[in-house]
Curated annotation (Swiss-Prot):
It comes from Buchnera aphidicola subsp. Acyrthosiphon pisum (strain APS). This is Large ribosomal subunit protein uL1. One of its GO terms (biological process) is regulation of translation. The keyword RNA-binding applies. Keywords: Repressor, Ribonucleoprotein, Ribosomal protein, RNA-binding, rRNA-binding, Translation regulation, tRNA-binding. It holds the Pfam family Ribosomal_L1. GO terms for cellular component: cytosolic large ribosomal subunit. The keyword 4Fe-4S does not apply. Belongs to the universal ribosomal protein uL1 family. It comes from the Bacteria. Part of the 50S ribosomal subunit. GO terms for molecular function: rRNA binding; structural constituent of ribosome; tRNA binding. Binds directly to 23S rRNA. The L1 stalk is quite mobile in the ribosome, and is involved in E site tRNA release. Protein L1 is also a translational repressor protein, it controls the translation of the L11 operon by binding to its mRNA. SUPFAM superfamilies: Ribosomal protein L1. The gene is rplA.
Length: 231
């Protein structure tokens, strides 16, 4: 057993995984239990009181985290005319129409977000089999189908997180990195949870946010005591 495995085993022996942890304790334990050399992401899983089998209770939205998520985001923009210069000035890595579509078909996906102006969607929809499974298809709700290209690129670059529930009614997202200051993680978490609350379907009854778990890429997952959050 190597040193990292021994350290992780020792840490796990002192963690009560059945306990609801204060948010400060949760972050401290996640930082303490990080044993890998790379900067792990801090991920959140939220169990919601929704019926995912009913389309009117499924959630799909986005929010911009105040402290970003700790990594650079590559943006592809489908647009034309004057918007090409605007997209370039805003920092988009890939810009085009049919030419960009052909590039993606031949070379695959090497970007994190796709943004499109409405007039470009006829081309983008033809990439459905490529973009759809990767959850990259532009969407009006997410602000990725827009006439305001500059704002959409800025949001994507500065910490916009897109989310949707899975078939079990759970939302998964990244809200930061292990090297973030505790307050930065808490600020991101509060903004994310506020967005989740606003996205609550009117048809959802009973307890809406049932469980919150924070974890790291290669580390442990801890349940958070919601009474210690700014909900």
């Amino acid at each position: 057993m190597n040193k990292k495995t021994k350290r992780m085993k020792k840490i796990k022996e002192h963690i009560n995984f059945a306990k609801l942890h204060h948010i400060d304790e949760t972050i401290d334990l996640l930082k303490k239990s990080s044993t890998v050399k790379f900067n792990e992401s801090i991920d959140i899983a939220i169990n919601l009181g929704i019926n995912s089998k009913k389309s009117d209770q499924n959630i799909r939205s986005s929010t911009v985290l105040p402290n970003g998520i700790g990594r650079s985001i590559r943006v592809a923009v489908f647009t034309q005319g004057d918007n090409i210069a605007i997209a370039k000035d805003a920092g988009a890595e890939l810009i085009g129409m049919e030419d960009l579509s052909e590039k993606i078909k031949k070379e695959g996906v090497d970007f994190d977000v796709v943004i499109a102006t409405p007039d470009a969607m006829k081309i983008v929809t033809q990439l459905g089999q490529i973009l759809g499974p990767r959850n990259l298809m532009p969407n009006t709700k997410l602000g990725t189908i827009t006439t305001n290209i500059a704002e959409a690129i800025k949001n994507a670059k500065t910490g916009q997180v897109r989310y949707r529930n899975d078939k079990n009614g759970i939302i998964h997202a990244t809200i930061g990195r292990i090297n973030f200051h505790k307050n930065e993680i808490k600020e991101n978490l509060n903004v994310f949870l506020e967005s989740i609350k606003k996205a609550k379907p009117p048809q959802s009854k009973g307890i809406y946010i049932k469980k919150i778990v924070l974890s790291t890429t290669m580390g442990v997952g801890l349940m958070v005591d919601q009474s210690t959050l700014s909900l």
